[in-house]
Amino acid sequence: MLSIKLVAIFAFLVCSSALPHERTLQNNPVLTADEDADLTVPELITKYGYPVEEHQVTTSDGYILTIHRIPHGKDSTTVSDKVVFLQHGLLSSSADWIITGTTHGLGYILADEGYDVWMGNARGNHMSRNHTTLDPDNDSEFWQFSWHEIGAIDVPTMIDHVLEVTGQTSLYHIGHSQGTTSFYVMTSIHPEYNAKIKAHFSLAPIAYMNHMTSPLMHILAFWSGPLDVLAKLIGINEFLPNNEFMAMVGDVLCADDDITQFLCTNALFAICGFSPDEMNATILPVLTGHTPAGSSVNQVMHYAQEINSGAFRQFDYGLANLDKYGSLTPPPYQLDLITAPIYLLYSHNDWMSAEVDVVKLCENLGDACQAKFLIADGEFNHLDYLFGIRAPELVYNKVISLMARH
């Protein structure tokens, strides 16, 4: 499968009429080094002077997951009782929360604000690509999961581990994109986990998707049926793995000051929305060193199903639904069972998370939806919550102020 680095060429062809203005961003406050692209998450955190721990947990169905912890800030030695768990989006990893540097990475910012920061990794990404009995390279059974299993099994397993280690009974949860989807799955099918959440913050929330505007995602959704059949026939189960080949392509196309770097930027824009003023081109080599982190084909197909159905429901197995669910169609997630306080942060220019879908989500969450906040930048896109130059100002400050209420 092609990564966003290769999709860049296609994205350029279909989106060349909307190219962003060329910017060198030499005065960008986000500081990065190209060597960061090759460092592991613990190596990155250590390099910038923060404490770090790496934990492994095993799920009930045998997946071995990695969690990274920043127990306190750079200038502190005290571990706080304020625990926060960060969950990444599709094709991502715990690296998302730190690769923009100490002044812009949410993981670092929260640690310096006095939080005990834990960053999860879902099954199938390169940090959680392990199992007690299955080999991801040879056993297709390893990849038979979507974001349903991530929300139903992975996230509660990681949260239980975090609470056990810290001795706390509840924590804050912050998710981006799929990290919000998996939270809604967890708290709707395991309502007992609502009591373990002080508050949840959805950055670019995704549940309902029938109004999303990403042209490439619409193309994928339209062809999802034939593509799914083809993937099964030729044995493709893993989507956009993180490996040496992908890293090499990223080095070639996305290097800082490289003439092809604009292809990478426009690939991201074509999927998530155009936001040239927020894109720090200097972090692209680091970003493409850590992303894509890998996922299952079924994770992507589950989102394609959401786009086509307009519903927020479990994975559609087609004719096998009757055996799986006892009905011809998958059951919807019962959002009315979610009681944890939820704050939704969304933006005009997010092609993946449409405003009308976020409003519908808030309505269906009922009293659990404490508030929804429109980002005060009309160009803010789906990835800017993580990598945008003004993400701390527009998003993180709001989240931290809201956390203080709970």
Where are the language model's segments positioned?
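Cleavable N-terminal signal peptides of Sec/SRP-targeted secreted and luminal proteins
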Residues: 2-19
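Alpha/beta-hydrolase-fold enzymes
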Residues: 19, 164-169, 180-326
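Short, surface-exposed "cap/lid" segments of acyl-processing enzymes
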Residues: 44, 59, 64-135
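Alpha/beta-hydrolase active-site loop
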Residues: 140-165
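Short beta-strand/loop motif that positions the catalytic acidic residue
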Residues: 338, 344-346
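Short alpha-helix in the alpha/beta-hydrolase fold that links the catalytic acid
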Residues: 340, 354-364
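Catalytic active-site module of serine/aspartate enzymes centered on a nucleophile-bearing elbow/loop
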Residues: 370-406
